[in-house]
Amino acid sequence: GGVRIDQQFASIADELTLGDLRFRPPCAWRPRTAPTEVDPWRGRLLCGEVHDENGWALGGVAGHTGLFGTVKSVGRFAQAVLKTFSGEPKIAQPATLARFVERSSVPGSSRALGWDRMLVTSSCGHQLSGSAIGHTGFTGTSLWVDPQQNLYVVLLTNRVHPTRHNEAILQLRPYVHDAIVQALTP
């Protein structure tokens, strides 16, 4: 076989000096990690482990879930994405990134390969450009990168604490993203 996704990501993260951004964080991170949900399936409060049940079944490592980080480390990743958009191959070759951010051909879909694209209903609000890409997490996280405006927004919350039955994030995300973009742009 090949290289596991967590090992491949750790190699990239080290090369880019992303710091605290990784799958399956060490137990030493738990005191500074926000808890998520009192999970009835696992019978305990989750903290420092993947929340997504499918991701947990896959050992805490999956392409759609399980990455832990700080605002600073996610911001460093966003900076690497912006540099790749500008032609400097930081996280991938620019042509590879272009493929990953290409909107799917499904009518009305905002999805790309691992990314969401801007729509009027997007979680990123209305201030980012049409070239913005983003990814949201069920637990209340999001990252939106706008190459046209050369900015990014990182939002890390624990909206599922103490339970997943909290939909306030759906209104909060667009508001926060819009407020940040308005504060950063002339």
Predicted segments — roles?
Residues 1-130:
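Short, surface-exposed loop or secondary-structure junction motifs
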Residues 135-186:
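Structured C-terminal helix/loop/strand segments within mature extracytoplasmic catalytic/sensor domains
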